[in-house]
Amino acid sequence: MNPLDKIHALDEIEKEIILCMQSAGQALQELGKEKSSQKNAETQSQQFLKSLSSVESKLSEQINYLTQVSTGQPHEGSGYASAKVLQMAWHRIQHARSRVRELEETKAKHSHAARQQLKRQQEHAAAQQQQQQQQQQQQQQQQMQQAAQQQQQQTGGGNAGSGDHPMGGDSSMSTN
């Protein structure tokens, strides 16, 4: 049953309640007469009880339907259970999205920290490499200086034996 049918069913129940009340009123009128007919009073009373029983069963049916709807139990012609499942699915999706967003933020924080640490390590490695290059250059300069000094000593030592003259001439040749 669709919602429109449910509304029509409730309208019918309302009409039966009105008939039930009219039957009760007619039965009371019959009993209130000075010359009341017991047969008419019984007929009206039976009609009242019959319509009351019908109203009670139809109202119970509607109450059962509303109980099913309100507790989310599946029932004929209702989209409530499907709507509830859909709503819960949307809720789960929203929760999953927020959790993914949190994880992405955490990842971004950690990857940023990792990039900074990697940058510091690279800078440190570059500084060490530069320092090693400077040390190598200093060692090369020292080796070159030592080689130059050794060469000067070797060339300077050979000149010292030939005389004190800066030109390297022989002192015995200078006397006449």
Curated annotation (Swiss-Prot):
Residues 124-154 have a biased composition (Low complexity). Its main location: nucleus. Keywords: Activator, Nucleus, Transcription, Transcription regulation. Coiled coil: none annotated. Residues 99-108 have a biased composition (Basic and acidic residues). Component of the Mediator complex, which may include CDK8, MED4, MED6, MED11, MED14, MED17, MED18, MED20, MED21, MED22, MED27, MED28, MED30 and MED31. Belongs to the Mediator complex subunit 11 family. Component of the Mediator complex, a coactivator involved in the regulated transcription of nearly all RNA polymerase II-dependent genes. Mediator functions as a bridge to convey information from gene-specific regulatory proteins to the basal RNA polymerase II transcription machinery. Mediator is recruited to promoters by direct interactions with regulatory proteins and serves as a scaffold for the assembly of a functional pre-initiation complex with RNA polymerase II and the general transcription factors. This is Mediator of RNA polymerase II transcription subunit 11. The lineage of its organism: Eukaryota, Metazoa, Ecdysozoa, Arthropoda, Hexapoda. The gene is MED11.
